[in-house]
Amino acid sequence: MYNRCCRKVWIQGRVAYRPAYIRQSPPQQTLYRGIDLLPFTTIVMDHQSGFQNPSPSGGLMFSASAKRFISRIVGFVGRGAEVQQKAVGLCPLKTERRRAAAGGLLLPTGLRMGRSIIMSVRPLPFLTGPAPSPDTAAGFKPSPPTGNLVSVSPLSKAQMALWFDYLQHPTSTHYFLTLKVELDKQPLSLDKIIQVIRGLGKQHAMLRTTFHVDTDTDDMSKSYMAVHDDSWDQEIHVLMNDAQLYEALRKPFQLSSESPVRWVVQMKLQPGSARSTYTVYAAGHHIGVDGASMSVLSNQLLEAVASEVEDQPDHSGPHYGDYIQRQARYLRSSAGAAAGRFWLSQLRHTQPFRWRMEPPEEINTPNYRQLDTWNFFPTAEIQEWGNLYKTSWFRVATSIVGLVTAAMAEPQAHHDHALMVAFGARPRGFENNVSHMANTMPVKFPLSSLLRDDATFSDAVKAMGRNVSTAKKHENFPFMSLMEQANRHMDPTLLDFKVAITYSPKLANKSCELFPVEGIWDLFFCFLEQEDGVALGVISNPRVFGAEALGQLQSLFNEVFALSKARPSFKLSDLAFLQNRTPARFISGPALDDVESISKSRVYRLIKARAASQPDLVALMSAEKGVQMTYRELAAQSSQVAHFLQKQRLCKGDAVLVHLERGFAQIVWILGVMEAGACYVALDKTWPAARKEAILRTANGKLLVTDDEQMDFEKQDTTVVFLAPSAAEIASMPQSTCECEVADDDLAYVVFTSGSTGQPKGVMVEHSNLSHYVSATRSLVKTGPHSRMLQLASFAFDAIVLEYAVTLAHGGTLCFANHPEVLVGEYLADVIDSNQVNFFHCTPSVLSTLPAGRRLPSLRIVSVGGEASPPGLLDHWRKRVELLHAYGPTECTVICTLESLTQDESTQTAIDATVIGKALPNLDIRICEEGKLEPLAPNQVGEICVVGPQVSRGYMGQEELTASKFHNITLADGHPSRLYRTGDKGFIDDDGKLHIQGRIGNREIKVRGYRLDLYEVEKNVMAFDPEVTQVSIQQVGESLVALVVPASIDCDRIRSKLLKDMPRYAVPTRFIRVASLPLNTNGKIDHTQASSLAAELVMHDTVLPTVDATPTPTAAVRAVGVTEENLRLKTKENGMERQEMLRRHLTAEVTALWAKLLGSSRQFDPEVGFFDAGGHSLLLTQLHKLIKERFGTGSRPSLLDIFSMSSIRKQVDCLMGIVDQDAMLGSEPTGGSSSRSQSRRSAETSSSSTSAPSSVPVDAERNLYAIVGISCRFPGANTAEQLWNVLMEQRDAITTFCPAENLGFALEENSVFVPRYGMIDALKDFEPSAYSMSDAEAQTIDPQKRVFLDVAADALADAGTSASPGNPLDPVGVFVGAATNTFLSSRDNPGSKPPGDEEPQSFANHYQQLLDCPIGTFASFKLNLTGPVVTLNTACSSALAALHLACASLSHGDCNAAVVGGVSMAYPQEGGYVTARPGGDSSAVFSPSGVCHPLDSRADGCVPADGAAALVIKRLADARADGCRVYAVIEGVAVSADGSDDKAGLGVPSSSGQSRTVEAALRRAGPQALSRLRYVEMHGSGTPWGDALEVQGLKMAFDRLSKTGAAEQSGTGRAQPEADRIYLGSNKGNCGNTEAASGLLSLIKASMALNLGVVPPLPNLAEPNPKCEFEETKFEPLGKQLALAPGDRVMNKRQRIVRSPNWISDATWFVISTVDNLLPKLTPAAVA
């Protein structure tokens, strides 16, 4: 035998081992299954080979990503810490042949004998396993495999989850399962039993398998299984007492050195007889075996011991590796995708169990979890039980488990729980395979929908049965894959599963018994099939469930079980533990169709009834303040208010004005006022004084309650109650319900609409109206106990009735925000999350501000109404929640029709936003002609009229208006009713649904949910300023715009007057002065034409200078991990001057943003608040977004900062403490940003900075070239800033792929396919329309062209070049180095012919590649550039060769600016590359390990990659004159070929050739270049000899320069010490070899390093490449960050960086520097 070292091949994050030594021998000796490397390839090795791996060193360390991933697999490892216990004490085991201490038994060779531990174990409850032990010390690490192996393969998905758990808790036994087989009824010898066990080991590979982690990595996903050959020493214990049995069965597995099944034979001597009886135990770890495996083993064990044949037939079936491959294919299939969608649906809207009981104070249980047997169900009984429901009894039992576990948990309104259900998940053909295939998956028990529908238990069984049935179809989808998907869509805290259910089929016969895994769940229900029935056992977490709680749970199970047999159709709401949890149900309230009883009910009494029934339910809460109020407290305090009001001698119908801050007190007073028989009128505290006074007059209020002792309006004759001074008196009032007779037609409240006239319209709502509305909502608004409703509406707005009355009458909780005025955007999302809001009502305008990226897991229902709803908005939210599209005038009590759009993620049906549903119960919607009351036929358009008990009394004090809108009618059944004409136009379709089509005649609108009459607003404008001769108010977007005549009007003065007397929403945001307004034929203002005029003027009014949205340097500095001190840019100004400059700069910036939103023609007072200047909450969110984008300040300022600091001055004060002073003064204020498409088409932007005079003489600048624009796409980076982060963080940006089943090429002998490649994410954002292309046309164009077009356009935009596209007098050249176009002939090209297609092709198609337009020409055409165009290919030096030509073209005056690019994208995209096997062709360029290590002793080649980049360069003098931002200055350039004299071959670099090019570049850069050189960015391909030859070339060049004295003059009159080290680096270890684009990648890296003053190190440098002989040179590979000192202006010193050559036969070198006095204008973020 001999050992062979193995090489590792990484396949989708999993490891497979391959022997490095490959014999040229027949395939039976070394067989590779699946040579094309399927995703989970099993590699079978030579049976004669050994296996050796280096010994592990150090402890097991989890990477940060591994820890995060492990923490997310909550279903397996997330709860281990909750049930920790002491590790079981173990004694050492011996492997040598020895005599047993007890009984004198001679053990066969290879068996292991355990020493005795005295312990009484009777009976054997330990077979369910102890709880998990604490996390192990850091010293634990699995060992590598030893011995003779036959195969290695990756772990299955399920095994990976269990392996993660094992690595965290290696001494835990919570995934043990044990098979017990009694062999006492037949005479057997021990030798026979041992022979049978060994036979099973030969037959089943899993019994010879160990588990391991790659020793060279800390990535736990790179784990694998090793299958040993038949000589593997199975662990068999032969024992004689229970103490030894305990030790053997409970001993933790060492899965890296023993198989996952441990055999224990307990021998018992019969008294007075020489015969012994035996009991065989198979103690298994769940990673290797499941229940079905134990069933297979029990059958085969009994069959084998009864057989006379020694060698039993192999029934094991396919190899487990085949199962893993099948699983991988399944996950990539459409069936796998469908399964993933189903399982995600089972998690959607679920919450973890939150147990109601307190954990037990003392835990007096053993250090294991016990299986507590609850019931035994005889076979006949359980079959009859299932027949009652025409389904499997297991589905009935699962439904009961769902009910009783929900009873033990806190109610989760609108959410369900998921039960972990175990599935066999064995594909056909694997029935006899001993392995782990069981799959425990979450199945939703839909209790919330069942309660909502008032379902029966039979309905519950059907619903759960459907879920289980569908789950069974998708049982092969792994739990790990589900968790990976769920973590992308859900909050990981929701993936905490606490209840599991399993069904274990019967074993071979009664002599067999299976002890299930204990698991990590709080409750594990085990249904164990036996010969004559099914036993139910429960394993519980003793730290969660004490004896009392378990007893209660068992009683509930038995109760529901008995009820389910006696009465299958009992209502779930009849169960005691589910009473008062049904949503949309009153406590002792009227039926939905009992009109008379509803009219006599009172909403405040319904709330009182809830308080009496469920007093401890939370009625009101605020998560921000951490306060809440129960129903008991709410009822008591509202009754105290009622008694207090009666003491004030209020009469029925008297109006009480409530002038309070939004909060609990508002609700208390509203309910108290109604209980006292009065009606309430809510006054919004933000309203102007005149508005409040007008309402006070109209309402004739008798009493006003306020918490504002300094009221800003006249109270007239109204009695005022100040809240604070009256608090003690109110608290002394009785808490009993106030006895007051309130009639059906008594007023409940008055809400004032429009408010734009001098006499506001007060809608009078009676108690019966309110009762009918709240009752009717039960039909669709399914809120109930524990539902949480957000309080969002103003209390003066009728939507507040939906929020408080519906929520509290149904037992829900109303949630308050600290700042309700700004409940939009991120703040709204924050409040929803912090309060766990389930339901809220808002306008479409507010709903549209919610960030699309916020998950909002608690949110289930959204009601939207108050204004027209965009179809796209409805469609988006319909896919996330249940959407209620509501319609209802205030005059009809909040809402009169509802369209319920149930959640449907997959729907493709467009929503008709005009459909607003059917009438609520007891209401009737009629369509009438104007001025008539007779209803029109269906589908005829007319005025929408509402008839029924929700129609209010009319307008307070406006009898004439009431008579025109409200009509008393008699219904067909003779009952009187009331009709309201809405003024809305619509029709009723054949399904009875109402469609709305705008307004009829008048100019009443809704803006941000507020109803407004534009005519009344116009009258007020005319009244406030007699100089106004004409005015037209129009709605543009969410704002009001006033067109006023004449043009000399002072609009600010008018607006200030309006704000004093009108609500803010009724005051136009913008006033636009015009010379005249359009008139119609009657000489009146034509408001239709005026509307178009207003929209056009607003559009032109908002054209502003472009805002520079570049992030500040502070953000970029933090991103790259460099200290600000290192990057601080020095200035001459003192601190005070800088502060004042910054304030002026910020003031101009913020003012520009205000102007963008509110009108650029306006002058803004810095002290005026945003709302007073015309803003509103929706515009405030836009302002907040613009400020954050403009200043890049992370989480600050928040929306609340902008709200509370509402003036320009205060916002500037806020920003002064946030922004980076030096960086901000490097840019000038502008006003907006152009779109991506515009930047591509025009490539024009305004410059963000100008440069100061340079210390470089003008004549010296003739051959200096400035880099003024940068754009790139490289692996792991779509911007230069992202590239910098990759480099600084030393990240490996190469992608590891799962190889395709069929590669596009054949593997040659001794070749290997490496599934690693540097991919770029560059095509998804390509917009064909931006370049006048169709999508179809773009798909046929070489991706290299598409990507380069993007980067070229972005680079031009970044440069802010003054060049004019298409102007021949201002030419811009294009010089691009590009790889060969392989897309034309690839299978990825839609235009290419499939293999075997013999159809004749046209000449153009046949010669397509020959005729293909060069990339440079294509780009110049699409970007309309008129300078010289060159496209070339010199392999890796292509981009720098193009740069050399561009510099020459600029020098000759051929163009004024040049776009220089490099692009390389290979097709087809195979997801890897082919190279020589390890130890094969030493000249191979590509790395067989898949990792590039430049200048490192581990270097074995490079890794290919795609890439694209573009620079814009100008002559330095032109760049300075144009005020361009300069990234770097090119000082020296040299290009040459090596020739052939001293080259080993075409692809081998020449040291002498390299040295000549380096020397030439440095000499052209001037005498200062060499003296200040600190760093060389090499090509660094990562080939051992290539890197060495490159270093040798540098050494030769520097030796010659030193001898000629080039280094003696530093430019400052002093010599530079030659002992200074020069550091070398390369980017190939980060991004791979990007071929034609690689030169620009290095140049971008060097430019950024100069600007930021730090050079990124080589990634993970180990030992330097010894072939480079660094000790003989002044060069050193850069292993850590290198700080570069900024240039000193006085001394005029500069840093230089040299760019190195490519790996073929020509070389291009550049020397670049910064211009010192331009440095303050450079920002790190500028390269983004």
Curated annotation (Swiss-Prot):
Keyword Phosphoprotein: yes
Outcome following mutation: residue 1633 to H: Decreases TeA-producing activity to 31%
Molecular-function annotations in GO: 3-oxoacyl-[acyl-carrier-protein] synthase activity; ligase activity; phosphopantetheine binding
Effect of a null allele: Impairs the production of tenuazonic acid.
Compositionally biased region (Low complexity): 1226-1237, 1244-1255
InterPro entries, A to Z: AA_adenyl_dom, ACP-like_sf, AMP-bd_C_sf, AMP-binding_CS, AMP-dep_synth/lig_dom, ANL_N_sf, CAT-like_dom_sf, Condensatn
Keyword Thylakoid: no
Cofactor(s) in the UniProt record: pantetheine 4'-phosphate
Region described as Adenylation (A) domain: 608-1002
GO cellular component: cytoplasm
Induction: Expression is induced by the presence of dimethylsulphoxide (DMSO) or by the deletion of OSM1, a HOG1-related mitogen-activated protein kinase. Expression is directly induced by the TeA-specific transcription factor TAS2 which is itself regulated by the secondary metabolism regulator LAE1. Infection by the totivirus activates the expression of TAS1 by up-regulating the transcription of the gene transcription factor TAS2.
UniProt region (Condensation (C) domain), positions on chain: 153-499
GO BP: any one term: fatty acid biosynthetic process
Carrier domain segment(s): 1141-1219
Listed result of changing residue 1579 to A: Decreases TeA-producing activity to 6%
EC annotation from Swiss-Prot or TrEMBL: 6.3.2.50
Impact upon substituting residue 1635 to A: Increases by 2-fold TeA-producing activity
PROSITE patterns xrefs: AMP_BINDING, ATPASE_ALPHA_BETA, CARRIER, KS3_1, KS3_2
Enzyme class label: ligase
Active-site residues, record numbering mapped to chain: 1436 (for beta-ketoacyl synthase activity), 1579 (for beta-ketoacyl synthase activity), 1633 (for beta-ketoacyl synthase activity)
SMART domains, alphabetized: PKS_KS
Domain Ketosynthase family 3 (KS3): 1262-1714
Reaction catalyzed: acetoacetyl-CoA + L-isoleucine + ATP = tenuazonic acid + AMP + diphosphate + CoA + 2 H(+)
Job of this protein: Hybrid PKS-NRPS synthetase that mediates the biosynthesis of the toxin tenuazonic acid (TeA), an inhibitor of protein biosynthesis on ribosomes by suppressing the release of new protein. TAS1 alone is sufficient for TeA synthesis via the condensation of isoleucine (Ile) with acetoacetyl-CoA by the N-terminal NRPS module and subsequent cyclization conducted by the C-terminal KS domain.
Family: In the N-terminal section; belongs to the NRP synthetase family.
Protein name (database record): Hybrid PKS-NRPS synthetase TAS1
